[in-house]
């Protein structure tokens, strides 16, 4: 049994907490981009893009990342199954 408050984050530096949070976010992003399915996201404003598809929400997140917009701007856009010959765009590199 550990010390009291150990699970509450006491004794953890802000830098360590930020690093942990970043690693979780980056891991989720990589898993989203490694999905086996493909979807075509169609937007009136941004056009069409083929992205990896684990779910419709994941496809919207990937499309928003490609287009450089917030996913809430495109949450009402259409997500369609991509044809077998279509390939998804590569994962963008974030700076």
Regions found by a protein language model. Name each.
Residues 29-47:
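Short aromatic-glycine-(Arg/Gly/Cys) micro-motifs in beta-strand/loop hairpins
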Residues 12-29:
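N-terminal intrinsically disordered, low-complexity tails
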Residues 2-16:
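Contiguous bioactive effector segments
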Residues 40-43, 50-52, 81, 88:
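Short linear proline/tyrosine/threonine-rich motifs used for host-factor recruitment
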Residues 21, 34, 61-64:
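Residue-level detector of alpha-helical secondary structure
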Residues 11, 45-56:
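A short, exposed loop/beta-hairpin motif centered on an aromatic-Gly-Thr core
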Residues 54-72:
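A short, charged, amphipathic alpha-helix used as a generic interaction element across diverse proteins
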Residues 66-95:
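Short, mixed-charge low-complexity intrinsically disordered segments
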């Amino acid at each position: 049994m550990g010390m009291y408050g150990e699970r509450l984050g006491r004794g953890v530096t802000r830098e360590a907490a930020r690093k942990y949070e970043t690693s979780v976010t980056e891991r989720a992003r990589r898993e989203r981009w490694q999905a086996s399915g493909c979807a075509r996201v169609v937007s009136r404003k941004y056009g069409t893009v083929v992205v990896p598809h684990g779910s419709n929400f994941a496809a919207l997140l990937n499309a928003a990342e490609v287009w450089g917009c917030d996913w809430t701007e495109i949450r009402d856009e259409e997500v369609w199954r991509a044809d077998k010959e279509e390939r998804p765009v590569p994962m963008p590199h974030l700076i």
